[in-house]
């Protein structure tokens, strides 16, 4: 994509995404130890169990953006993934995906959306710009061994 040009993209709200483009996008974005390493069956399961999945496709039908959230459907949700292909960054696609994700969850009656693991000043600025704010509490995690 040429610098300075806004891409013409199609956003889609659907869990029916083939696993191969999802893996390719995560690999291109440098997530090699995460979803890029998952099997097609694991990716299908991830999609199926997500509350909401948004994808962005370029005119060549290549997956260039992906956002997903998990939720209880009532009280809160969690941004699970937000990935934009490196060639499509800094053009507003991440903002569009996150705003649509948050807006859809709000329209579904889910009043609270969390985003965890936000690292670095650019990421924090990005999430603040889209309406998120930092919480002043500890977050605990239990990892399977």
Predicted regions located by residue number:
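Conserved catalytic-core motifs of GNAT/GCN5-like acyltransferases
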Residues: 114-116, 128, 133-145
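A conserved beta-strand-loop-helix scaffold within acyl/acetyltransferase catalytic domains
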Residues: 41-60, 64-83
